[in-house]
Amino acid sequence: PKFEGTPVAEFESNDRSRVSAFARLYGYESDKHPGMNSLYITIGSEMSPQNNQGFYLDVNESDRTVEIRRQENKTSQRVAYWHFEDLEKELHLKHPATLWVKAESRMNGDIAEFKYTEAELTRSPQFMTFISLIKLGVVTYDWRGYTSKEGKYEGKNHGNAWRVKKKHRNQLFSSSEVIELI
């Protein structure tokens, strides 16, 4: 996301460090990463935010942006955002055609074994449908990482990601084909 004009930009002047700064600014204590600020949350629409930190997604049609907003003390503030055109470009770049695979797994001694049970091939994502699904809370955004509380940024960014609920995947793509697995 972009952070210009947000509290994150005020907190961290270096644009390359702002994803880490976001976790430092809004993260929480976690037993899994002692001494660090963790931020492992799902962010949904205002009606279905899916986290306890006050974050939600808002589609700003007039500015043509999708915003991460933070609700605090009965006020809402934009803390990160994407321009429609950037999101659309990335959506088409990442998912011109995508194979979604479901597998069952088991351990056989030290070796993990997988049995592929389902596959679905989707093509041609529909951007305005993506925007509509954000509004409905069907498309969400996961923030996944942790960082040091101060000083040099240390920790791990697991890569933040957009998610679509499986049962709504066929709405997002103009073509969806289930592939039989033997």
Regions from the PLM with identified roles:
Residues 1, 7-182:
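Nucleic-acid endonuclease domains
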